[in-house]
Amino acid sequence: NNYQMPVITIDGNIGSGKSTILDKLQKNHNQIVSFEPVQEWETYLENIYNNDKGYFDFQLKIYLDRAFIQTRSNSILYMERSPKFTYETFIKVYKDKFTPQEYSILEHLYNNVDQKYNKSVVEPVLYIYIQSSPNVSYNRIKERDRESERIIDYNLIQLLHNKHEECYDNISSTGGLPTFKINSDDKTPDELAELIINYVQGNT
């Protein structure tokens, strides 16, 4: 039998440390993880950051790549970024970059498709929010020096930080969906992975 794999999402701003934490969960704790395919998205990202174009194409690509998962087993899957956080952060920050029709399509995909297609969109059993201050996130982005991210400015990181905070507060205040917030500013990726494993073992 195939079981629906329980999904735990790791959300947070650009530069909060999500990929590194997932890497530690996989290598040190033998967990199944799903990374964002950043290399495949490089050309989309460069078009956005360098030419201020292609926002809708990229969001559609993200949705197709990330909003659905295969049913594989009953093991936990740790997934980088949830559809809900993607919608509430990036799509809302870039709202004026879409035509009204494009925004309406994205809104429909993220908010209606789960009812229409019987909850096919990823629904995490736990949202883990990796909180990081805009300063720390911005410095990490500069340090890792990904080509597509070189033009990112601090204001964007601040805006995205605010949206992530709002999204986390909304999810946790409704009480319907389990959430766990960790600040990554002064912790190593090893410590963060350890905290996540301990929390998940104690709460699932």
Q: What is each residue range found by the language model?
A:
Residues 10:
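Hydrophobic anchor at the beta1->P-loop junction of P-loop NTPases
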Residues 27-68, 88-90:
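Conserved substrate/cofactor phosphate-moiety recognition/catalytic segment
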Residues 63-77, 112-118:
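Short amphipathic alpha-helices and their capping/turn segments at secondary-structure boundaries
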Residues 88-166:
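A glycine- and Lys/Arg-enriched "phosphate-lid" helix/loop adjacent to the NTP-binding pocket
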